[in-house]
Amino acid sequence: IMKRVLFSMVLLMAVSFAFAQEKNVKEAKSIAGEVKPDFAKAEQLINEALTNPETKDNAATWDVAGYIQKRINEKEMENAYLRKPYDTLKVYNSVLNMYNYYVKCDELAQIPNEKGKIKNKYRSANSKTILAERPNLINGGIQYFNLNKNEDALKYFAAYVDAATLPMMEKENLLEKDTILPQVAYYATLAADRVGDKDAVMKYAQYALKDKENGQFAMQLLTDAYKAKGDTAKWVEKLQEGIVKFPENQYFFANLVDYYSSSNQNDKAMQFADDMLAKDPNNKLYLYVKAYLYHNMKDYEKAIEFYKKTLDIDPAYAEACSNLGLVYLLQAQEYADKAPADINDPNYATAQAEIKKFYEAAKPYYEKARELKPDQKDLWLQGLY
């Protein structure tokens, strides 16, 4: 009998404690809804409920937690509207907290009940609130980004992007309709790179590739992330992808060629160039790649042939002009190394005349490079002075 009494008392205490926590949730919501809310008290009550085993797995608990943050935001914005002092960071922090709480609420509300049914009564209202307040996640991210607090900035930018992939936001089709998402994703990528979070770089760079202005730089960061993690195969794959996606960006091409050259894999580099040319025979970049590879392999005649083909497609390709000039200079040097150095040698004059021809062949290409890019002296200075 004593054991039964003790067991009953334990059950009674557990029920009472659970009831007390549920009461805290209701009280926290009530306080937050007052005209002059005591947010410190409301947050204290809800924070206890968020960690208590009796209430932490209830969707209602997280819904109220989100509601409190929503009310904090509303009160700060009310002060701003009335031109009273208000805390900008509190506005942004409340939006991020609200977002996180509502996301958790939705996850819990999607768990089927004992009958196997899902009754999510929170999704409709909470998704609308997130959608309305989502722009402030950008503002918060910018605020912290400009303060060089990149970990905090990443949280905001990441939340903005992640919102587009949430099941509760599926009907909004944000990945297609949100035109500034790629730009925000780029800043998420940048912040992630600054704190060394390569996994986050990989995650958000994928969305940033569509950003017209910074997509190429997101691709660079993505490529570097694979290299940093030691995934050489994926790194090479992304370099190749970068060449195709952003043909004007020399980073991908230069790194790929450097990798193949340094690892004695010129045949693979040439195969890549040939595969690209098979798909697009008149693509100036692929012709340039092939010329550059021959150039590195010291097959100067082939290099000249493909640099000229490149310039046939685009006469204003300054780098091709510069490299074509350089190949002629290299031929001159190669010829000079074998030519007689003695001025009294009967073949000396003939050899010097041949060397001069190479320099004369190089000059117009260096002049063209200077005309096209006068500020980039490294493209033409060595060939003209």
Q: What are the functions of these language-model segments?
A:
Residues 49, 105, 160, 207-208, ...:
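Canonical positions in the second alpha-helix
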Residues 52, 108, 163, 211, ...:
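Structural marker of alpha-solenoid helical repeat scaffolds
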Residues 56-58, 167, 181, 214-215, ...:
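Residue-level recognition of tetratricopeptide repeat
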Residues 64, 173-174, 180, 187-190, ...:
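Canonical tetratricopeptide repeat
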Residues 61, 169-173, 184, 217-218, ...:
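TPR alpha-solenoid repeat register
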Residues 68-151, 155, 159-182, 330-365:
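Short coil/linker segments at helix-helix boundaries
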Residues 21-81:
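Start-of-domain marker
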